[in-house]
Amino acid sequence: MAKYPDGESLKKREKIQNYFWNQVGSKEHISLPMLEHAIKIEFNYEDDRSIRAQVNLMQTEARIRMESRVKVWIKQPNKNS
């Protein structure tokens, strides 16, 4: 498992948010496994705990909203960053 400074992790989460926003926008949702796979690739994580922590951070930062165990809604990224 790779460790990243907070600033670098924030940028990686923003990149994931922008990627999915450009794919589906606000009209459709993505699946939780799809988001977890993107986090796994971007952060180079293998363990589920670290992936789950990043999903929770994305919820805390209001980047995503989880409707159920599988539906994940992407919130619109800030344009000023």
Q: What residue spans do the PLM features occupy?
A:
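Residue-level detection of the helix-turn-helix DNA-binding "recognition helix"
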Residues: 40, 56, 60
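Short amphipathic alpha-helical interaction segments
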Residues: 45-57
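N-terminal regulatory modules in eukaryotic regulatory proteins
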Residues: 2-5, 26-29, 64
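Short acidic, hydrophobic short linear motifs in intrinsically disordered regions
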Residues: 26-39
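Short alpha-helical segments that sit at the start of domains
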Residues: 1-22
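Short, cationic-aromatic polyanion-contact patches
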Residues: 69-81
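Alpha-helix C-capping/helix-to-loop hinge sites
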Residues: 22-23, 42
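A short, conserved structural fragment
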Residues: 59-69
